Amino acid sequence: MRPPGFWSRPPTHPLARLLAPAGRVYGGLTANRMDRPGATPPCPVLCVGNFTLGGAGKTPTALSLVRLLRELGRTPALLSRGYGGRLAGPLVVDPARHAAAEVGDEPLLLAQAAPTIVARDRPAGARLCAASGADVIVMDDGLQNPSLTKTLSLAVVDGGAGLGNGLPFPAGPLRAPLARQWPHVAGLVLVGEGGPGEAMAAEAERRGLPVHRARLVPETGSDWAGRRVVAFAGIGRPQKFFETLRSLGAEIVAEGAFPDHHPYRPGDWTALSALAAREGASLVTTEKDAVRLPAEARAVVDVLRVTLAFANETRLRQQLAAAFPHA
């Protein structure tokens, strides 16, 4: 879904006030659900979640955590609900065989780095992770899902967006009241800079939680300086992607902002191709969008790849080592 504009306005906005009663009900139900005890998994669980609906940088965070766990001698597998996919699982994602419409876009990206299980039933998915040889499970999203007991939960926050107006859905982007969510996390991953994120960092530190600051770094290999591009993205914050391209020197002649997890259809591709041809520009998108494109499109669209770089990776490594000691 595309976040409505009033979510980033003050909570006194008329639409926010109108929807606030529904938000109190939704947020209260979600918070009560979070407090329920979960099933004991066959191996420890590291949950990568966020306080809000929409993108915050969970996927690159999960990929970085997989790398760090391996460096600590662990054998991680990734567990995802498979948002946007029609298969309920549990199943092992095979990028050569599965499409985004089947398993979701994020699992296809995750599966390039480590064994990835899609399962609507998280406990069943955890059992398949263990059967696949994992000794620790990295759960992509699921902070508000109580079905599994988590060893460690990290909340990812977009530094520029923060928590929007701070209200629960549908009045705002929060999945539950923030005060009810804090007790469920053991640390904050702050992606990017911005006043909203710094306010969250200050609150986390006041609560005695570590704050792991990070930024998305474009991978080298392509020279974007001076290139005319038609940039398009269906992610949580498309403008963030466009800003990154501009920072690399690309000349964006047209932007296409689609809802998060948008399933690209032939008509979308035809329109984008025609626009690029008219402008004498190349098409560029994100890794997450690329896996949702038709096969013929993936061959001709440029992809901006990014990795997550931590300001103090040692501190995060120490937290992981304490939570998941190598036997």
UniProtKB/Swiss-Prot annotation:
Coiled coil (UniProt feature): none
Any single Gene Ontology cellular-component annotation: plasma membrane
GO MF annotations in UniProt: ATP binding; tetraacyldisaccharide 4'-kinase activity
InterPro entries referenced in this protein's UniProt entry, alphabetically: LpxK, P-loop_NTPase
Reactions listed under catalytic activity: a lipid A disaccharide + ATP = a lipid IVA + ADP + H(+)
Family membership: Belongs to the LpxK family.
Protein name, as recorded: Tetraacyldisaccharide 4'-kinase
